[in-house]
Amino acid sequence: MPRESSPDSHHEHGVAVEPARPEVAPPPFYQVMLLNDDYTPMDFVVDVLQQFFTMDLDKATQVMLHVHTRGRGVCGVFTREVAETKVAQVNEYSRMNQHPLLCTMEKA
């Protein structure tokens, strides 16, 4: 007697067939950048890097010097939402402390 198959059957000739899963692309990442200015004290920049990017003193100092000598530097790479939050936090903190330090983001 022939075997009846239902339209919902996932078997074809005795072999299990998994339904196709759509490929999900990884989320885009963004670099959070600090821009150099002539007014923000270096120790404030180090504090920002430690506080908002969890860098130790040596790493924060290294990034601060990079920003100071090259005009800008990467603080970290994050998903869009995290990058947006960090940019907003740093810019607000800088303004609250009356410093012109500017934080931006760009696609990595």
Curated annotation (Swiss-Prot):
InterPro entries: ClpS (IPR022935), ClpS_core (IPR003769), Ribosomal_bL12_C/ClpS-like (IPR014719). Residues 1-15 have a biased composition (Basic and acidic residues). Residues 1-24 are annotated as: Disordered. It comes from the Bacteria. SUPFAM superfamilies: ClpS-like. GO terms for biological process: protein catabolic process; proteolysis. Belongs to the ClpS family. Binds to the N-terminal domain of the chaperone ClpA. Involved in the modulation of the specificity of the ClpAP-mediated ATP-dependent protein degradation. This is ATP-dependent Clp protease adapter protein ClpS. The gene is clpS.
